[in-house]
């Protein structure tokens, strides 16, 4: 038996986040931003607080509070008991518009993201032109002692962890764990 849980995108424009579960497999279809929810709480220059973003998004009902789904550095920093093993096998991205993929940067980097080559290139462009992290997850809360003996926050490529992005060919059938994907 297969279950589908809608965590967004119902009676709304965007925010698509559907969890498809079978006996042995859990796959998210998209992980996007709801335009109405985002506009209700945020603006162009006001977003979730950087050091408390997951809690903000949980409290506002924008992201589902699912243990093991989110990046370990965020979960640990925000005292969210979510840094254990994940039960989600993958994210299947239908296409790389923000209403389908905007919250991928919050996901654990070891959860594979299945997408078309075109979507991968669009997400790569998001990385290169903004501060989002679709292809790599840069650890946000890692500190170290610098060569002056001062405490610094690690940044840039030093703390980048590549995501597992798997390419599928548009229009072709494929298997994602025990789920068969077809047109």
Model-based region annotation:
Residues 84-110:
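Di-metal (Zn2+ and/or Mg2+/Mn2+) metal-binding site signature of metallo-dependent hydrolases
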Residues 15-20:
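Short beta-strand scaffold segments in enzyme catalytic cores
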Residues 8-10:
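Short Gly/Pro-enriched turn/cap motifs at secondary-structure boundaries
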Residues 4, 30, 95-96:
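Divalent metal-coordination and catalytic microenvironments
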């Amino acid at each position: 038996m297969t279950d589908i849980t809608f965590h967004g995108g119902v009676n709304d424009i965007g925010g698509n986040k559907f969890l498809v579960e079978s006996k042995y497999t859990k796959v998210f279809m998209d992980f996007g931003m709801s335009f109405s929810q985002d506009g209700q709480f945020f603006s162009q220059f006001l977003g979730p607080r950087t050091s408390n973003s997951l809690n903000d998004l949980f409290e506002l009902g924008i992201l589902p509070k699912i243990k093991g789904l989110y990046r370990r550095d965020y979960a640990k920093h925000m005292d969210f008991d979510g840094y254990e093993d994940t039960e989600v096998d993958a994210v299947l991205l239908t296409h790389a518009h923000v209403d389908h993929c905007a919250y991928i940067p919050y996901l654990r980097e070891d959860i594979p993201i299945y997408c078309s080559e075109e979507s991968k290139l669009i997400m790569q462009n998001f990385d290169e032109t903004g501060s989002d992290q679709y292809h790599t997850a840069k650890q946000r809360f890692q500190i170290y002692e610098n060569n002056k003996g001062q405490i610094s926050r690690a940044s840039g490529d030093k703390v980048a962890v590549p995501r597992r992005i798997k390419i599928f060919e548009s229009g072709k059938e494929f298997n994602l764990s025990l789920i068969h994907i077809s047109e």
